[in-house]
Amino acid sequence: MSIDSLTVTTIHIIPGGPMSRLQWGFAGTSSTTLKQTDPNNNVAEPIPHCKWAHWIDSQHDGPVTDEGDMYPQPDGTVLEKGSMVNPATGLMTDYEELWMDLESGSTTKDEMRWSLVLSLDDKLNRAKGMVIRVGEHVQGIMKNDGRITVERWVWEDSRLGVKDWTRKVRLGDDFLPCSVLFQPEGMHSGGKVRYGEFWWAIKELYHW
């Protein structure tokens, strides 16, 4: 079965948490190149240099980029060192972030793993958004006429002792089609999903 468009007609209104809990949210694309070894950091191999383009950003209305060098750590994490404009000061500022990889597990008996991207770009209503699923994780962000909404879901043991999707975070009061990605069978790249008042485009869909 192939679905060109899907309409979700029932949406349960669940108030979100206070936006004061969101320090920063963004979504977009990233690219990586290798740079020569930095002698000041005692790294023998070329260092990955990553650049993130923020297509949607809770702190800015226009496009934003940040970039940094990625240094593998002995415990398996990766230390990112870079610089970007500090939203609080408007000045270019150095920063450090520590990253950790997570497994992209399966949610089905056949051990199939899914990766999907939904994108919203409604210029008439000043609405932009992106919802992404990788394996057992779904999260998204939307900016609707200046209002920010974010959600995160994880496939984990529920209170009933069985695996199920659990919402870990919801801030803001608009609607994100996270639940649509729980059952992607029949969806295809290039299709559309109507959720609430908006049509979301299925930009990417993979399974392995």
Residue ranges and their predicted role:
Residues M1-G25, K35-W208:
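Lipid interaction determinants
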Residues T29:
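Catalytic phosphate/metal-binding cores of nucleic-acid and nucleotide-processing enzymes, i.e., regions
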